[in-house]
Amino acid sequence: MSKRDFLLEIGLEELPARFVSDGEKQLADKVESFLKEQRISFEQISSFSTPRRLAVLVIGLAEKQADVEEESRGPAKKIALDESGNWTKAAQGFARGQGVSVDDLYIQEVKGTEYIFAKKFVAGQETASLLPELKELITSLHFPKNMRWHTYSLRYARPIQWLVALYGQEVIPFEITGVAAGLETAGHRFLGENVTIDEPTLYKEKLLQQYVMADSEERKKAIRHQIQSIMEEKDWVIPIDEDLLDEVTNLVEYPTALFGRFDEAFLSLPNEVLITSMREHQRYFPVKNQAGELLPYFVTIRNGDHRHLENIVKGNEKVLRARLSDAAFFYGEDQKLNIDEANKRLDQIVYHEELGSIGDKIKRVKVLAASIAEKLGVTSQTLQAINRVAEICKFDLVTQMVGEFPELQGRMGEVYAEIAGEPPEVAKGIVEHYLPRFAGDQSPSSVQGTVVSLADKLDTIAACFGIGLIPTGSQDPYALRRQAAGVVQILLDHELDLDVDELLLETVEQLQEKELLTVPESEVVKQLREFFALRVKTKLQDEGVRYDLTDAVLASGISNVPVVFKKAKLLVSKVNTPEFKELVEGLSRVTNIAGKAEKNVAINPDLFEKEEERVLYEAYVQTKDLVQGALASGDVSAAYAALEQTIEPIHQYFEHVMVMVDEQVIKENRLALMHAFAGVIGSYANFQEIVFK
């Protein structure tokens, strides 16, 4: 089959950097899906992007759709044939609709009913006649924010400036917002010119001649290499923030790295202030010496070549000087602010219109933190530090520095607390109570940071649930999933013996006492338990625990999160052992039949008729104490070993004892034993969830 290469490019006004990579991926995915749906074969798809363009190159695109033979089902046989075996009007109409003769109809059985079928040959259409449909594909791309321009109804990330749609040497005709597809693309805005693409595979080469590196990965690689060259030349260390690298890659079409300098006096500012000023406001990379100390230099990436670099350097230095001067002013002014006075201002800052001020939240966090500290049995000195951290952990929200750089909240609190003479453990707790900030971030290392972090996150989550602000689908404006995942991570990292159910109930009760709930208390607690169970489930699956083993351990509850994970990991280590299946089958048999038991029926050993009943009862009594004690101390191996010892008594019991006998008293007594034993088993896991292939 004949093939041609195909190029599709959308030329735009400058896209925000965060739109570019996703836009490129969307376009490539949609083009690939379109070609597959249309049965048009191809050899390879490549994608390209810059701030001014999104493009796809398809190599070896067939000139025709694949031919296909389609099978269509018609009416049931009893409707299609009359009593004489002749085709009815229904059958004849079906044949006409399919474009075949009634002689070509045939009968097949589907789920016990016979139907008539027809096969028809559908010849593939010319690819060139189908490609104009890509217009709808282009307009279907979605972005975080869209705009309209002129009088067009289309809402899009930025106005479309040009379109290239070239199949071999044939332009595919279509138009969007008055822009017709053609052969001409734009080079670099200042260094290049418009250029005609007369062959799809020459796209990258022709753009490079016009100072555009169309391949985003090649741009990123070039930036990394240029930074590395500066490092080697100057004997510097330039930490490459991957997020910043991605951003600058999508800000430029032709990258050139350069470095500049700032006044050494600014090095008196905290490192985080300097780095944040450079990274967040200017997209600069900070520079360090081999000892890891910040130097008064920066590296930035210009969108252009090496011409007139000295002017570019001076301009960047001037802008950074203004930024750092502002930061130095904020830093000086903030130190004039008394911490307790700053804290009082939080009473005037609304946390949420239905939940009061940030000051109100701090009061709740302080109560909850004290309760958690008591459960952990901390010393009086540590409790004092926890109380102070909880009391002032948000004071830096009123500082000018955090107002300018919100991402420095907590860190500036630590710095200002140290300057104000707060104990080191209190200052550390302030910054740590925000941890972990994101997936993969570290947990608080100090007790005070850990306790206040848990209290703060639990209050935030419960308060939002209490007024109906529950994450749905991809919508989670208050980052409640992330905060719940942070709670789970802290509990795991420090193996904290804290009852999650108890903590959730206590948090909600405090909100109820403050009359802040708009959802019934019992409903809030139920929703929170389900929410946290899902976070634990996600974490288990992220760590490679099989879905059925995950469901098995979650069925026993999540009150002690570290124990849940230990149980799951132990099951993972046992699942492929020969005796595991026998264990699961035996324990599941007990659990299964226990479902038939009446509630609250006591076991009466005097009603046992067979030795196997007495043996199993003794095994139950012994196992109950062993399993409960082992799980309470977190020794899941001992709990599992105790369950293993019951397999032989269980096997012998079911071999010689009939549970569902006619005599009601005996049956109820035997079911009572099953029910009690199932409770012990269920405290470890629901083994019925485990699947064997």
Swiss-Prot record:
Its EC number is 6.1.1.14. It comes from the Bacteria. GO terms for biological process: arginyl-tRNA aminoacylation; glycyl-tRNA aminoacylation. It is found in: Cytoplasm. It catalyses: tRNA(Gly) + glycine + ATP = glycyl-tRNA(Gly) + AMP + diphosphate. Its main location: cytoplasm. Gene3D superfamilies: Isoleucyl-tRNA Synthetase, Domain 1. InterPro entries: DALR_anticod-bd, Gly-tRNA-synth_bsu, Gly-tRNA-synth_heterodimer. GO terms for cellular component: cytosol. One of its GO terms (molecular function) is glycine-tRNA ligase activity. Keywords: Aminoacyl-tRNA synthetase, ATP-binding, Cytoplasm, Ligase, Nucleotide-binding, Protein biosynthesis. Belongs to the class-II aminoacyl-tRNA synthetase family. Tetramer of two alpha and two beta subunits. This is Glycine--tRNA ligase beta subunit.
